[in-house]
Swiss-Prot record:
Keyword 4Fe-4S set for record: no
GO cellular component: cytoplasm
Main location: cytoplasm
Binding site for (6S)-5-formyl-5,6,7,8-tetrahydrofolate: 37, 95, 135, 451
Top-level taxonomic group: Bacteria
Name of this chain's protein: tRNA modification GTPase MnmE
Gene Ontology MF: a single term: ATP hydrolysis activity
Positions that bind K(+): 242, 261, 263, 266
PROSITE patterns, A to Z: G_TRME
Assembly description: Homodimer. Heterotetramer of two MnmE and two MnmG subunits.
Cofactor mode of binding and number, as noted: Binds 1 potassium ion per subunit.
Broad EC category: hydrolase
């Protein structure tokens, strides 16, 4: 063990400028174990003040925590010491693993909060410090946020890949190729009297940027796959009144989400349910029944139903098996006829669509399997591409547009260099090295306090 007096702040560059922050790093409420994380120049001091000593780095050690104000024992806990820069934030960090009772946590947090230049952390502040200290880049931070929010197996896999730097590494490889091409162009600017790019330089630049442009286009071609995995596949249930839309929603959700009634017009607004369908996140939306003689309020719901249907990845068009209704035209890219209340009629033959009964469960499993297969084609779980957010897609589009100009247009060497510079900057923005504070604030606001 290391005596507390020997534990000086390892991150001395931050000691004079940064406050020390603390926060629970585990969930709210009572639990067997709770964790409080501390980061900043006073982390070692706080560890010594409460535990009486500073343990060996990165080794869990049993200690009795005392309130420095009155010396009263707070809890028997495991404490850990992470001297910077070898820590999550890059600063001196400490962790207190205590019993998860509310009184224990309240006592520990109160004791920490009484020290000067020590304050509770803001949402995402630990991760923000990791970003500022170069421990993570912005794409990895986004992957970490997605990992915390992941609810399905596909989301977990994609988030882990992002968190481990898949996008960052690939973007940097592309950027290095563009920087090499840029150096060739700038050499021509510095050492040539010609206004246009010499043929030899043009060929060498093209050899560097054409593979990058091809890769960017390939990623943009499957851009929606990654976003679907992260945000969820949009499936909208539509059809005439009393077709069983709300009953199907409740059956797939396995709980009473929507009111089911024989009275037409019961559902007047959109009702959304988030589901885990065989590892794929799905946003299932129930809509108002479509009919001509609707009142004004119901008409608003019908208009919203059409709008959501046109935006959906998949529309399930429901109508009764005894009285099938064809779906309207231009409803969406993918529309499946689904015939409901099929347990009341003879088996349907020679009819395109799937016959089910949401009440009895007849063929409901087939519908789920069909949706899962459809989701797998839209968003393959093995490799969904690097793009998981609109921000990524926009950066790829800016880079691709600039490189396309480089190849298609016989521009003066100065314009060629500028387009190469724009493409490289677009790729650099993926890792956050030139991002604005506004974008950072939006991302970190979604983090929990202790992260």
């Amino acid at each position: 063990m290391t005596h507390f007096a020997q534990a000086e702040p390892a991150s001395l560059s931050h000691a004079a400028t940064l406050e020390t922050i603390f926060a629970p790093a585990s969930g709210q409420g009572r639990s067997a174990v709770a964790i409080v994380r501390v980061s900043g120049p006073k982390a070692g001091f706080l560890l010594g003040a409460l535990a009486g000593y500073c343990p060996e780095p990165r080794r869990a050690t049993l200690a009795i925590l005392h309130d420095p104000e009155n010396g009263e024992a707070l809890d028997e806990a495991l404490v850990l010491w992470f001297p910077g820069p070898k820590s999550f934030t890059g600063e001196d960090c400490a962790e207190f693993h205590v019993h998860g009772g509310r009184a224990v946590m309240a006592g520990l947090l109160a004791a920490l909060g009484r020290f000067e230049q020590v304050r509770p952390a803001e949402p995402g502040e630990f991760t923000r410090r990791a970003l500022l200290n170069g421990k993570l880049d912005l794409a990895e931070v986004e992957g970490l946020a997605d990992m915390i929010e992941a609810e399905t197996e596909w989301q977990r896999r994609q988030a882990l890949r992002q968190m481990r730097g898949a996008l960052s590494r690939q973007a940097e490889m592309w950027r290095q190729a563009l920087l090499e091409a840029l150096s060739l162009a700038e050499a021509e600017i510095d050492f040539s009297d010609e206004a246009d790019v010499p043929p030899e330089t043009s060929r060498r630049v093209a050899a560097l940027i054409e593979p990058v442009l091809a890769d960017l286009r390939a990623e943009l071609g499957q851009a929606r796959a990654g976003e679907r995995i992260r945000e969820g596949l949009s499936i909208v249930i539509m059809g005439p009144p009393n077709a069983g839309k709300s009953t199907l929603l409740n059956a797939l959700a396995r709980r009473e989400v929507a009111i089911v009634s024989e009275i037409a017009g019961t559902t007047r607004d959109l009702i959304e349910v988030h589901l885990d369908l065989k590892g794929c996140a799905v946003v299932l939306t129930d809509t108002a029944g479509l009919r001509d003689n609707a009142d004004k309020i119901e008409q608003i719901g019908i208009a919203r139903a059409y709008e959501r249907g046109r935006e959906a990845d998949l529309v399930l068009w429901l109508s009764e098996a005894e009285a099938p209704v064809a779906p309207p035209e231009n409803l969406g890219m993918e529309v499946w006829p689904v015939f409901t209340k099929a347990d009341r009629v003879e088996p349907l033959e020679n009819r395109e669509g799937l016959a089910i009964s949401a009440t009895s469960g007849l063929h409901l499993g087939r519908l789920v399997e069909a949706i899962a297969d459809f989701a797998g084609k839209l968003a393959p779980s093995g490799h969904a591409g690097l793009i998981t957010r609109a921000r990524h897609r926009q950066a790829f589009e800016r880079a691709a547009a600039a490189l396309d100009r480089c190849i298609r247009e016989a521009s003066p060497v100065e314009l060629l260099a500028e387009d190469l510079r724009l493409a490289a900057q677009a790729l650099l923005s993926l890792t956050g090295r030139i991002e604005t504070e506004e974008i950072l604030g939006e991302i970190f606001a979604r983090f929990c306090i202790g992260k």
